[in-house]
């Protein structure tokens, strides 16, 4: 059964389930991402198939307390009349680094959703959506200053850049189509520790086809816009019929 469960991480990296921390959700809800707030007191999630967002308060012992209006369906007003909830797919979350604002990709209508949240409880309030010229936006990241937001767009293998001068109203300022290395899709993305480069994972949906699996590297200019470096992408091999999914950049000196 689909659920959310909290774990303790030991100094050796073992995961130990926290008693009574499991929150079960209906079968077929398809939880896809969880994201902890900067103060580590709240947790937000997307459920792709059921078309809802969930928010939780993280209690001192690690258990999860669901927020007052959770689960919260995506607003019907943003979708074509009569479209069923399965077409209301949220995918990809990011929190503004200093403001109580949550960003959510509305995948099926190519828009970026903006929510505010209560810091004490995690209660979400829908504010608006803004357009994304990319197709099927899936993953989101912001820079540490909270001035730029980036989405990886699976449908057209691109990255969209937003200006966050007003964090509640992101404004698209660029869309970059990634260099082609076969039929593949942009998935997760990350910024390096000094935010000089943005990396994006490309993958094929089939583990039996490796052409197109790669790592794209884009230079981050002073204004936060992007340009892909000439050596990009780096082809990634398939190991045991796997494909790449997920990426993080760390400081090797840390």
What do these predicted ranges mean?
Residues 1-33:
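Asp-box/WD-like beta-propeller blade repeats and closely related beta-sheet repeat scaffolds
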Residues 2-4, 51-53, 110-112, 157-159, ...:
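Structural signal for beta-propeller blades
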Residues 6-15, 55-65, 114-123, 161-170, ...:
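Short loop/turn segments immediately following beta-strands, especially the blade-tip
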Residues 24-41, 74-101, 131-147, 179-197, ...:
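Beta-rich, blade/repeat-based domains predominating
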């Amino acid at each position: 059964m689909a659920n959310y469960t909290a774990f303790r991480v030991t100094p050796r990296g073992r995961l130990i389930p926290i008693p009574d921390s499991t929150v079960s959700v209906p079968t077929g809800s398809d939880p896809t991402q969880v994201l902890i707030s900067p103060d580590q007191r709240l947790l937000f999630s997307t459920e792709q198939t059921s078309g809802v967002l969930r928010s939780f308060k993280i209690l001192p012992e690690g258990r999860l307390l669901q927020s007052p209006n959770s689960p919260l369906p995506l607003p019907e007003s943003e979708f074509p009349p009569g479209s069923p909830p399965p077409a209301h797919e949220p995918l990809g979350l990011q929190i503004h680094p200093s403001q109580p604002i949550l960003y959510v990709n509305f995948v099926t209508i190519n828009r970026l959703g903006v929510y505010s949240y209560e810091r004490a409880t995690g209660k979400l309030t829908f504010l608006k959506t803004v357009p994304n010229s990319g197709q099927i936006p899936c993953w989101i990241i912001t820079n540490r200053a909270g001035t730029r937001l980036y989405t990886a767009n699976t449908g057209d293998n691109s990255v969209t850049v937003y200006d966050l001068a007003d964090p509640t109203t992101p404004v698209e300022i660029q869309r970059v189509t990634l260099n082609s290395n076969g039929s593949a899709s942009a998935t997760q993305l990350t910024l390096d520790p000094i935010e000089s480069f943005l990396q994006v994972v490309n993958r094929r949906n089939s583990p039996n086809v490796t052409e197109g699996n790669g790592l794209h590297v884009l230079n981050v200019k002073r204004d936060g816009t992007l340009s892909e470096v000439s050596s990009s992408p780096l082809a990634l091999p398939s190991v045991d019929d796997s494909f790449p999914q997920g990426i993080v950049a760390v400081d090797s000196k840390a």
